[in-house]
């Protein structure tokens, strides 16, 4: 235990006057009531124990008579006893905000959710299928920001009015709502965001029978990424198999990026495109960073670390809606679409006119697949070896 502290369960045993260790207590409990003589170590090794459970039956002739039911049947019987509903609400905690204990931390409030890319809010996530059936919508307003419908969400007679995010890949018949928001006690006014989903919390049962209805009003979201798919831009995230990758030299897969300088395509390695004067690189330490995109889960821990290390300003919900967030790095999220890259490119090239053909083509390409794959693309800070924070970068 950390710093020789007692495990919580062992403290409970001591307070009850029991000197046995918690490990031995668990072994004894399993041995007497579950294992029926089987090996505890074997069950621990297997991660499970397959056996039978005894259930008492009410019988006036023989109160001690027991019947055996396989544990699998017992589990199925428990599931079958659950109430059926058109929709199920899943209560969850966000990667950043968690259960809300740190809701007074503006870094966490402004941290975009890795999947929805939305900050300063919790919301009801629904599938496109259910949103269409309920009349719920998301749409972009004139400045490009994301707005959406409100929904009245009712669980066990309690109703909350919650904004709605239509989430690609969400299972039909399920809706999600994050805990940790809606606090009013002990928080600054700016941090009192979202709705308090703990009103729906029932012990450890985080899946609830729910009723969802369209409500009046229009909610303004602070969403940092409004494009959901690659839209034919295959250079953003390059994917291939190892077999195909080995058919070419690695330099052919990693060409030098080009930028426009005086309307001329120029390599980014050219001194002419550097905003800073060249300096002597022959002395001192040299730092580099490589990210395994196969391992990145988009958790955003690096985003918070960078925000904290460099004391980056928090701009608030209104400015985030105006695309003025000041994170020095971000983790973009892209969904796969129903069309291939080639089909997306063909759509763009064959469309005629911006306000008619191309605009409609881009709108179609922006829709994620019903069951999409998700790719994360870290976009690092652009200080290009000139920032004083580089030597202590926590990322």
List each language-model region with its residue ranges.
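A cross-kingdom feature strongest in bacterial/archaeal respiratory oxidoreductases
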Residues: 1, 31-328, 340
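Non-catalytic, well-ordered alpha-helical segments in soluble enzyme domains
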Residues: 6-33
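A broadly tuned preference for mixed-charge, low-complexity surface segments
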Residues: 7-11, 199-219, 341-361
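Short, well-ordered alpha-helical packing segments
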Residues: 12, 16, 300-303, 307, ...
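A short local structural element in Rossmann-fold oxidoreductases
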Residues: 13, 27, 135, 307, ...
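Ferredoxin-like iron-sulfur electron-transfer modules
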Residues: 274-298, 327-334, 361-395
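Non-heme iron-sulfur electron-transfer modules
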Residues: 309-369
């Amino acid at each position: 235990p950390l710093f020789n502290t007692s495990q919580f369960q062992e403290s409970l045993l001591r307070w009850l006057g029991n000197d046995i260790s918690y490990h031995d207590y668990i072994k004894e409990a399993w041995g007497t009531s579950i294992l029926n003589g089987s090996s505890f170590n074997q069950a621990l090794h297997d991660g499970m124990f397959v056996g039978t459970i005894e259930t008492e039956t009410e019988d006036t002739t023989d109160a001690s008579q027991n019947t055996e039911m396989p544990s699998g049947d017992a589990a199925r019987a428990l599931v079958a006893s659950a109430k059926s509903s058109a929709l199920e609400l899943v209560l969850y905690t966000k990667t950043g905000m968690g259960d809300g204990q740190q809701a007074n931390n503006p870094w966490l409030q402004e941290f975009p959710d890795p999947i929805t890319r939305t900050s300063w809010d919790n919301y009801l996530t629904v599938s496109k299928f259910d949103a269409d059936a309920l009349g719920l919508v998301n749409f972009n307003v004139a400045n490009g920001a994301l707005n959406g419908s409100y929904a009245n969400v009712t669980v066990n007679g309690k109703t909350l009015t919650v904004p709605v995010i239509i989430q690609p890949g969400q299972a039909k018949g399920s809706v999600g709502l994050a805990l940790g928001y809606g606090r009013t006690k002990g928080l600054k006014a700016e941090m009192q965001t979202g709705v308090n989903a703990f009103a729906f919390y029932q012990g450890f049962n985080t899946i609830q029978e729910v009723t969802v209805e369209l409500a009046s009003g229009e909610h303004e979201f602070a969403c940092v990424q409004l494009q959901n798919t690659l839209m034919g831009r295959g250079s953003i995230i390059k994917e291939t198999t190892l077999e195909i990758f080995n058919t070419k030299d690695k330099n052919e897969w990693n060409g030098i990026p080009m930028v426009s300088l005086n309307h001329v395509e120029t390599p980014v390695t050219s001194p002419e495109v550097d905003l800073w004067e060249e300096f002597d690189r022959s002395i001192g330490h040299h730092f580099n960073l490589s990210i395994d995109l196969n391992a990145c889960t988009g958790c955003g821990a690096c985003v918070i670390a960078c925000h904290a290390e460099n004391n980056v300003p928090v701009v608030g919900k209104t400015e985030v809606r105006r695309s003025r967030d000041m994170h020095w790095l971000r983790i973009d999220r892209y969904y796969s679409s129903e069309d291939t890259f080639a089909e997306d490119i063909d759509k763009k090239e064959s469309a005629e006119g911006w306000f008619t053909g191309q605009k409609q083509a881009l709108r179609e390409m922006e829709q994620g697949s019903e069951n999409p794959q998700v790719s994360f693309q870290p976009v690092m800070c652009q200080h290009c070896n000139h920032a004083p924070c580089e030597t202590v970068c926590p990322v």
